[in-house]
Design a protein with these regions (language model features):
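Extracellular, repeat-based ectodomains that mediate carbohydrate processing or recognition
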Residues: 1-187
Length: 187
């Protein structure tokens, strides 16, 4: 699974996983970028030239290591900030009933990651007599690409999924703005 963004000039950023979280508990999050004919780690270190592709996933540094942490993950979004540094959102799944949203920003040296909020469980609706097929479908968390300090998300509050806007500060502090409340249907 992969998400892309670009500076619309010379750089393409890739956010990806090594699989689907229902298939394996060891699903991690990776980031690389392509510029001037080369694939590079987030820190700028060359991985390989375009002519040497494909990129071998085992050579790519992890943003989040599911093996080390023992919790599977899945990607949501990627944008570039005003300094052309990547900002990402993704989910972690301690269990099928407990989804968590994360926000990570590259500061030029390292990834700074914060837990945004618990997301609730899966948003998949199970029809009577049917079994759950997609336990890792969260409500979602996406970035405002014109200002990636801002995220929009859907999380379970009470019995419904509600929408929120959050502004993430430089030190991880958050301002929360509910966009829906006391809804009768999921958002």
């Amino acid at each position: 699974y992969v998400k892309y963004t670009s500076d619309n000039k010379s750089r393409i950023d890739f956010l990806f996983t090594d699989g689907h979280p229902k298939q394996d508990a060891a699903i991690s999050v990776y980031h690389i970028y392509y510029q001037n004919g080369e694939f590079r780690q987030t820190n700028g270190q060359k991985i390989c030239s375009y002519s040497d592709a494909p990129v071998v996933i085992g050579k790519v540094n992890k943003v989040y290591d599911a093996v080390k942490n023992g919790v599977r993950s899945w990607i949501w979004d990627i944008a570039l900030d005003k300094d052309n540094h990547p900002v990402i959102t993704y989910a972690r799944y301690p269990s099928e009933m407990k989804h968590q949203y994360y926000y990570a920003r590259w500061d030029g040296r390292e990834w700074n990651t914060i837990k945004v909020t618990d997301a609730g469980n899966y948003i998949t609706i199970i029809k009577p007599g049917k079994k759950l097929l997609e336990a890792h479908y969260s409500g979602g968390i996406v970035l405002d690409h014109s200002n990636p300090d801002i995220v929009f998300l859907s999380r379970k509050i009470g019995n419904q999924f509600e929408l929120e806007k959050r502004i993430i500060g430089a030190n991880g502090e958050q301002q929360v703005f509910p966009l829906t409340q006391a809804s009768r249907k999921d958002n």
